[in-house]
Amino acid sequence: MIGNSSKDNFGQQQKLSRGLKNRHIQLMAIGGAIGTGLFLGSGKSIHFAGPSILFAYLITGVFCFFIMRSLGELLLSNAGYHSFVDFVRDYLGNMAAFITGWTYWFCWISLAMADLTAVGIYTQYWLPDVPQWLPGLLALIILLIMNLATVKLFGELEFWFALIKVIAILALIVTGILLIAKGFSAASGPASLNNLWSHGGMFPNGWHGFILSFQMVVFAFVGIELVGLTAGETENPQKVIPKAINQIPVRILLFYVGALFVIMCIYPWNVLNPNESPFVQVFSAVGIVVAASLINFVVLTSAASAANSALFSTSRMVYSLAKDHHAPGLLKKLTSSNVPSNALFFSSIAILIGVSLNYLMPEQVFTLITSVSTICFIFIWGITVICHLKYRKTRQHEAKANKFKMPFYPLSNYLTLAFLAFILVILALANDTRIALFVTPVWFVLLIILYKVQTRRGHKVK
């Protein structure tokens, strides 16, 4: 059994539990790529790009697949790799590992802040008198308790969360196909394939609108790399991880492109309200009375799922950082069930602070945090691709023996890095995201200072 190890106060060797099974990983690979970016953000993306949003999802999906293939090849090249920190330290050094580890932690902490705030907003749909902070707080407590139990319970939670999302999207696609086949007619006109090009063409807002849509499209894919982080806790990583990664293209075509294709065939893109979920609008058009409540429930569980994934991934990252002396040793303590309890409490406190900030100034903080988070994820993805390039160049013997290889290397690596740089340029074009490009460097400067201070103290101790 492979796992990160540490010693408890009694000097006994402990390891992270491998409690995740194949079905957990396969559905987590889907669930990690389905969230508020698709359920809510797709309305804004369609508003910018029109039907060409389908191409934006396809293009982004290709590069996300390349990122996942490079991540998978790295993780499977060395049984000692269990997270980003492990291979970044190996190829880029301790400082890069320190920055990467804490940045990935911050990525998911910021997402959890937004998701738990969203849980409160969605709950108010049914219970408008309930304070917005209360459902988020209760959700955090419940998720913390469940994550403290066992790794297997986390897997079960994500399995059912992801299953709800999958069923909702499949129901939309099947319903949409039936409506198109029967020529269903709404107030905006009949459901037809012609809706894709009869309202200004595939690129109704030109290349400018198409390019601006990538901001929200990339955000919709944030978290797709979580399947890689779980590599250290799968029962058979050599078999499970490649299968999960290789199925990503099919899932992107079905759950992203397929769902939006059906939506825009039923409703012309220019009729959809960008401030509402297109999923809710389509189900409402069908005449299902409880459609809004059904989708609201799905979106709520989606937010809870993202928060659950955040709590899991950040605790494992903090545990790994503590094991490598990049965080206080107290954070690497494991329970009798081999769960990093102190790391879970640490991440929960950080998320709780974010819930309070989102309550005090929800609109400003949400936009800023999600934009900064997106930039940080781009950093993580870029570092992964760079590490893969160095692995191929410096470990050629290991690379030849690795059966799970990055396709079209090294062209795919360089194209992916160029795409990520392109997304940063897009973020600079939009007024509501430009500020994130100025704020994010502060985070990296802070980490560099902390690393230097920690290293200096370490030398003094020695």
Swiss-Prot record:
Topology term for the membrane: Multi-pass membrane protein
Main location (coarse class): membrane
GO biological process: amino acid transport; transmembrane transport
Membrane-spanning ranges: 27-47, 48-68, 96-116, 134-154, 160-180, 209-229, 252-272, 279-299, 343-363, 366-386, 410-430, 435-455
Pfam families cross-referenced by the UniProt entry: AA_permease
CC terms in the record's Gene Ontology section: plasma membrane
UniProt cross-references to PROSITE patterns, sorted A to Z: AMINO_ACID_PERMEASE_1
Intracellular or extracellular location(s): Cell membrane
The entry's keywords: Amino-acid transport, Cell membrane, Membrane, Transmembrane, Transmembrane helix, Transport
Taxonomic superkingdom: Bacteria
PANTHER family: D-SERINE_D-ALANINE_GLYCINE TRANSPORTER (PTHR43495:SF2), GABA PERMEASE (PTHR43495)
Function of the protein: Probable amino-acid or metabolite transport protein.
UniProt family annotation: Belongs to the amino acid-polyamine-organocation (APC) superfamily.
Name under which the protein is recorded: Amino-acid permease AapA
